[in-house]
Design a protein with these regions (language model features):
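Membrane-interface loop/short-helix elements at transmembrane-helix boundaries
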Residues: 210-248, 262-272, 276
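Alpha-helical transmembrane segments of multi-pass inner-membrane proteins
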Residues: 33-41, 65-105, 109-178, 295, ...
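Actinobacteria-biased recognition of intrinsically disordered, low-complexity terminal regions
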Residues: 1-34, 135-139, 143, 181, ...
Length: 349
């Protein structure tokens, strides 16, 4: 009989199929996700209305997440081991074989930006460890965990210390997940960790930390990045409802205009959404992350698989708090795939 270790919903029937209560709960969670994503897409159109603010970038990101999630649900149901293992291997191979690998130059594979590549590798670590927990034999589990560790080492080789630290965190959380009896506590911990990261960046941007600590963090994050964050906070305060409009941060930001070769974003998903779509957009971003955690809580997969995926997605959220890695549709699609894999209901043997 299949069981969902530490799950929040009812147990499966003896024939391996979901019971009526579990199907209803899963449908409600899916409906909630649809409502959040559709609401966010609608709000982006409202924020763009009446001004030269194309919402294409956000709509593409939402489409990538949705398509990735659907793909992950299907692949995870059919191939609970091969699908996440294939995802992890594909990311690692793409990072290794593309021209300019490990150089940190403009053509660094596969996205042309080392930190975005590192974000993909964090997801690869999570996918490999999810596959390891679903693998039937200890040797295969060892191989898959080695693949996950290799993805983390590759992030360090690309020059992303934050990506390496996130991958190590995913590995440690995955190894510890078997000792967690209730997944809800761990998922709440992931939410709190993300909230602390967001609060910390806001404190740096508004210079509300003690002077010594603020100067130290600003030095590590770089002064131009912190200046962009301050511009974004100012825009959100001046335009709290609709923001300045999607894709208009660079036009409105003195810091971004000064750095003509820099990124057209505040290098933070949180600050970008707040500046360009106001506080309603920021609330929808938080609701989307909360929905992902709720989906993992209700997932019929084992607790180690769920918490491993949750750790990887939390690592990605922390990277997105201090960099614009979610501006890449490939990253958002990969995040959707991993969430779908962890939420899938494997078909009965």
């Amino acid at each position: 009989m299949r069981t969902a270790t530490g799950g929040a919903s009812g147990a499966m029937r003896a024939d391996g199929r979901d019971g009526p209560e579990e199907r209803v709960q899963g449908s409600r969670t899916d409906a909630l996700g649809v409502a959040v994503l559709v609401g966010w897409a609608t709000w982006s159109l409202i924020a763009a209305a009446g001004r030269p603010a194309p919402p294409d970038g956000l709509l593409l990101a939402l489409l990538a997440v949705t398509a990735g999630y659907a793909t992950g649900r299907i692949a995870g149901a059919l191939l609970p081991v091969a699908a996440p293992a294939g995802m992890a291997l594909a990311i690692v191979v793409a990072t290794l074989v593309m021209p300019g690998r490990l150089s940190g130059a403009a053509d660094t594979p596969p996205l042309g930006y080392p930190n975005a590549d590192a974000a993909l590798l964090v997801l690869a670590t999570g996918a490999a460890c999810c596959a390891a927990w679903s693998a039937p034999s200890p040797p295969l589990r060892l191989v898959l965990r080695t693949l996950g560790a290799g993805a983390g080492a590759l992030a360090l080789a690309l020059g992303s210390t934050a990506g390496f630290a996130a991958s190590v965190g995913v590995l440690l959380c995955s190894l510890a997940a078997s000792h967690m009896r209730r997944r809800l506590l761990a998922l709440v911990g992931f939410a709190l960790a993300t909230a602390i990261a967001v609060g910390g960046t806001y404190a740096v941007a508004t210079d509300t930390l003690p002077s010594g600590l603020s100067a130290s963090l600003a030095g590590q994050l770089t002064a131009p990045r912190v200046e962009l964050w301050r511009d974004a906070v100012g825009m959100a305060e001046d335009h709290p409802v609709r923001g300045v409009g999607p894709d208009r941060f660079r036009v409105e930001s003195a810091g971004a205009l000064a750095a003509t070769e820099g990124p057209p974003t505040p290098q933070s998903a949180v600050f970008q959404v707040a500046a360009e779509q106001g506080f309603p957009g920021l609330a929808l971003l938080g609701a989307a992350f909360a929905w992902v955690l709720c989906t993992l809580w209700r997932s019929p997969r084992s607790t180690p698989v769920v918490l491993t995926a949750g750790a990887a997605l939390t690592g990605l959220s922390m990277l997105a708090t201090v960099d614009h890695v979610l501006s890449y549709a490939v990253v958002t699609a990969a995040a959707g795939i991993l969430a779908g894999l962890a939420a899938a209901r494997p078909l009965p043997d």
